[in-house]
């Protein structure tokens, strides 16, 4: 039974429960009994229930309006009718069949009126089901009975003598006589209509059954026959690649499996669960009628999703970015190069976007050409009107007015055309910029989830989200600035210069060029200063945001200790810093705008003056003043924004640089397409050495040291030692300040205690040197005499040696750690854990218990040694497979601010709703959920704050049931629970850990006697053994065990 159930539903052919719920809501309780109630009362098994629903799904033929099914369970026959158009489902007892069975078996316990014979009108009373295991079985029957003419079973006769599975048939009519073998069947082979008739000696009146079923070769076969002796043949291959042939459905199931199923389903009341999420959450299908998605298996679903998201393409792009970043020889700015590669890679694979870019540039050019002609048309119009006025007596007024009106219309049309082209450009390019931003967002989000856990945890709250938000916005802003502002300004400027040279005079163009150069130079210099001020403002803003976020996230702690005033003071302090920096930004903006206006108006004055001189000499007409004035004002409009453009571009590049630094970090991407399974769960730790990794900046410094490319700050500070006031005044405070400067620079490299202590020692050593040489230094109030050059040389040499020694202390030579270092948590740790063993991990807090599990999950990398799972080194197992086969129940479960059903399904989104509910029952959670107002649709709140600790732990356990991993980790799972919740959770965990390798991190001693192995962390030593062996042979464990028990007592 279980194998059939798994075959039907883990392959995602259909969710039986969801399909049933599409029909069950229309049943009338006073006439019909709910099919689920029949199932729950142990009169129907999962196998038949699944078969019924699966058939009703795959036989969804357009020409069929009604489906009739028969089920024989627990000595009772049932008939099921589904009316497709009306969406109704009827279930009734087959009274005639039950009476016949009662007479044959003399079973007085069978009640043929369980559901009322009055509903037999809705059913086809004499239909039975049976199936061969495969078509080969039918062929064997055909061989055996090929020459027999008197068949007792018409179905076997047809299979053996008439129906060829490799040809197409269409069964149109079946005439049923009674429970015996009196059957008439019409079979249409291709275009030939043949009537095959089989009669027993006893002839009765026939009745027509409404059956219309197709046979489609061997890849897609549906057959429905009327057999004898309570059976019918049903062969079905619903999927071309994964044929499923239904088995013979026995009326008796294994008692042990029945008992287990009864325990699972004892309290399910599906009618109380909202049907909406059953349909919407199933396999991520948006359309419940999307049969193709329902027919895919779990692995195929995931594989299609994997291909759809193009994860391999993302990995390829990220690897290329890492290579570009490592190539330091290229003279081009690395950030610009990486950004260019991302744009190029994205645009080359999107032909539609190429067309949109071309259209956008075309609209841009048309817009600028139109806006350039507006001042020319206006000037011509004024000149024409002026000419008309002066010569009104000598020319035809009508023709002159006509030309003026045409010029005026052309002027208005050019302005409208320019505006229209601008809007078309905006609408087309907005699609491009948003798609690129979405692409980069997907790339960054994928990268974040594959970064080293230590790096992510080292960041402040909200820092990564801040970088992500600003980086994505900056990409959109940069593209908009480039296309909507920088490129248009360049095009406009070139066109304006051409018109000024061609229409006016080259001197006007030269004056304009010179003033524009001054304008750009002034704007650039001021904006650089403003960028620094703006960075200070952004930093103050981010600090304010971090304080606000941290305070809100810890609001309970604030209220516990009544520190609301303290939090308010801290927030106001940072807010004032932000206020000060924001005022400075506004002041610098005002100064920038003032200087820009001075330059632009000076240029306007000079150009207008030169034009006036030419007009006064009768070289140009009067209208040229308007032409020059309009041209320069149109040029000034985008130039007024140049400072903002420059600043936004610089800030965008800064924000993008922060994002790029994360994108180019080297990672080992999990192979999401790999479906390899860990079968047993045997684990072996072999000579493992591990210590917590240094800060990543120090690691980078070590790499630079190995490559002999030391940090320039260090080199500058070392070289500056030669110039500590030219070593003329060792006592001078500037000398000591240089050491403090060196300390601050190194602290910028790392904030670790190791570095800080080393710098303090260096500072102390230096001051001691100062005191030792103080006696040798002679000075007065005006001059400072030079010290001995040997002292200078020795001092310089010793400082360099101290720095080099400090760096070498952190260096790993030939990838082999310094095993004498006392910072190692594990030294030569070895342990073998067999499949299904229960292993307790105990020891003092901070001794490395959780770190051992993080090594197993590859959150950290071992410094030396190997870890094996099923005799495979975890370095050779991709991260996806590794972590997919390990389930963790942490001490504090974090939930997403979503529904309970979403949080449970987070363990396996490919599960069905029925599997989710069964997991909730196993986790002792279902009853609590059903008491809630919205049941499985209840929102859990931020990080699950609306639920108790026990409820959150049970959700996590339900996730683990759905994940169904071979290795379970319980990390102090019951440390914060009361006794009642502990008992319920222990009961659920007993089911979860049955037959699986289990690690239990705990401080509770009462269960240690039942553990197969105990890993005991004692200082730098780790002891492994059973409870009895450790109690007998290890006095440290004995003392620890006794001390914990005494505390409990």
UniProtKB/Swiss-Prot annotation:
ATPase activity is stimulated by reduced glutathione. The chain crosses the membrane at residues 357-377, 397-419, 481-501, 506-526, 591-611, 619-639. Residues 807-1043 form the ABC transporter domain. Its main location: mitochondrion. Changing residue 534 to E: Putative binding site for reduced glutathione; reduces ATPase activity in the presence of reduced glutathione. The keyword Transcription does not apply. Residues 1-90 form a transit peptide. Disruption phenotype: Conditional knockdown results in parasite growth delay during erythrocytic stages. Accumulation of organellar iron. No significant effects on parasitemia. No significant effects on mitochondrial morphology. GO terms for molecular function: ABC-type transporter activity; ATP binding; ATP hydrolysis activity; ATPase-coupled transmembrane transporter activity. It is an enzyme of class 7 (translocase). Gene3D superfamilies: ABC transporter type 1, transmembrane domain (1.20.1560.10), P-loop containing nucleotide triphosphate hydrolases (3.40.50.300). ATP binds at residues 843-850. The keyword Transmembrane applies. It is found in: Mitochondrion membrane. Belongs to the ABC transporter superfamily. ABCB family. Heavy Metal importer (TC 3.A.1.210) subfamily. Homodimer. Interacts with ISCU. Interacts with IscA2. Interacts with NBP35. Interacts with mHCF101. Transports glutathione-coordinated [4Fe-4S] iron-sulfur clusters in an ATP-dependent manner. Required for optimal parasite growth during erythrocytic stages. This is ABC transporter ATM1. The gene is ABCB6.
